[in-house]
């Protein structure tokens, strides 16, 4: 008798495409609980820059893996995989539907597929050498090093995320294995019965929404939020490598004007959105739904509910 896989709903897409609102509608319709698939929303005190969902927006839907780490703590893909798989079991045991929402492709891929990690080997001297190289030549040159030896990992990791770039280089250095190939047998069949929903939008409109979101973040206190982290002495932590924090750090360090930092933030956010879409399109079996106006939210929601019903056999509570 064939073993039935656990149904899981996954909602992905680039930043500012509208995942948050739709995720709540889906969770309510399918008695779901949401697991954050965002690599930076795990950090406490980093609310505005990560576009963290508010308690009002949650509207009573339980959310997991938000605010579980201090900003000075590190967090790995392997740890994320372990925590999410545990949460999926816990949610299912309560008779609820597990749902993953986010945009960090490698993290989500590690959960859904038979993705195993090499032993956590490290070489402090090599890391120090790469950190010195980055200080002398800048993050783009360091990223080029990674691109030369592991192009797939380079596509998934932003040049500003120096810690992850160095870690990917360190994996190759210590194990001889590419981080992007740490997938057992390149297993392509998901471990779960997955309804994989992707949201997309006309690029120019998406970029406009990204700019509006950043302007809103600044109005809501992003500069003050980043300043508090900077003043607390957090300088080389994984958390402040995130888009929205790294750029403003250059301003606080006196390397550029505030306007230049904001423009760089907008540019990096656009590039990241493009990379997010490319990653999910190329790496996973996503069914895409176009959210470009004049589509009506209610009509698009019904399309997605029909897809979930066909894929998982789940009936929405309307």
From Swiss-Prot:
One GO biological process term: tRNA modification
GO MF term list: ATP binding; tRNA dimethylallyltransferase activity
Pfam families the record matches: IPPT
Reactions listed under catalytic activity: adenosine(37) in tRNA + dimethylallyl diphosphate = N(6)-dimethylallyladenosine(37) in tRNA + diphosphate
Cofactor requirement: Mg(2+)
Residues engaged in binding substrate: 15-20
Keywords, sorted A to Z: ATP-binding, Magnesium, Nucleotide-binding, Transferase, tRNA processing
Residue positions binding ATP: 13-20
Top-level taxon in the UniProt lineage: Bacteria
EC numbers for this chain: 2.5.1.75
Record site feature (Interaction with substrate tRNA), residues: 104, 127
SUPFAM superfamilies: P-loop containing nucleoside triphosphate hydrolases
Segments for region (Interaction with substrate tRNA): 38-41
UniProt record similarity statement: Belongs to the IPP transferase family.
Biological role stated in the UniProt entry: Catalyzes the transfer of a dimethylallyl group onto the adenine at position 37 in tRNAs that read codons beginning with uridine, leading to the formation of N6-(dimethylallyl)adenosine (i(6)A).
The protein's assembly and partners: Monomer.
HAMAP family: IPP_trans
Protein name as annotated: tRNA dimethylallyltransferase
Annotated source species: Bacillus pumilus (strain SAFR-032)
């Amino acid at each position: 008798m064939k073993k039935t896989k656990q149904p899981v709903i996954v909602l992905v897409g680039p930043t500012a495409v509208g995942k948050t609102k739709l995720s709540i509608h889906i969770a309510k319709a399918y008695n779901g609980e949401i697991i954050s698939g965002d690599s930076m929303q795990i950090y406490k005190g980093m609310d505005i820059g990560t576009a963290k969902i508010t308690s009002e927006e949650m509207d009573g839907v339980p959310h997991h893996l938000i605010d579980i780490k201090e900003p000075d703590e590190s967090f790995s893909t392997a740890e994320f995989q372990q925590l999410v798989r545990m949460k999926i079991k816990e949610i299912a045991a309560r008779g609820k539907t597990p749902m993953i929402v986010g945009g960090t492709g490698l993290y989500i891929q590690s959960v859904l597929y038979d993705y195993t990690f090499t032993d956590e080997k490290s070489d402090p001297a090599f890391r120090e050498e790469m950190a010195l190289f980055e200080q002398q030549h800048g993050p783009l040159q360091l990223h080029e090093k990674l691109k030369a030896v592991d192009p797939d990992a380079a596509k998934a990791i932003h040049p500003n995320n120096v810690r992850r770039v160095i870690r990917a280089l360190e994996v190759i250095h210590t194990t001889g294995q590419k981080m992007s190939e740490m997938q057992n047998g390149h297993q392509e069949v998901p471990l779960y019965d997955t309804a994989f929903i992707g949201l997309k939008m006309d690029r120019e409109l998406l970029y406009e929404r990204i700019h509006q979101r950043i302007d809103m973040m600044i109005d809501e206190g992003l500069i003050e939020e980043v300043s508090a982290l900077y003043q607390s002495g957090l300088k080389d932590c994984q958390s402040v490598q995130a888009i929205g924090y790294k750029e403003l750090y250059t301003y606080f360090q006196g390397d550029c004007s505030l306007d230049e930092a904001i423009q760089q933030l907008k540019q990096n956010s656009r590039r990241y959105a493009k990379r997010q879409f490319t990653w999910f399109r190329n790496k996973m079996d996503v069914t895409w739904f176009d959210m470009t106006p004049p589509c009506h939210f209610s009509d698009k929601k019904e399309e997605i509910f029909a897809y979930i019903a066909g894929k998982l056999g789940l009936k929405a509570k309307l």
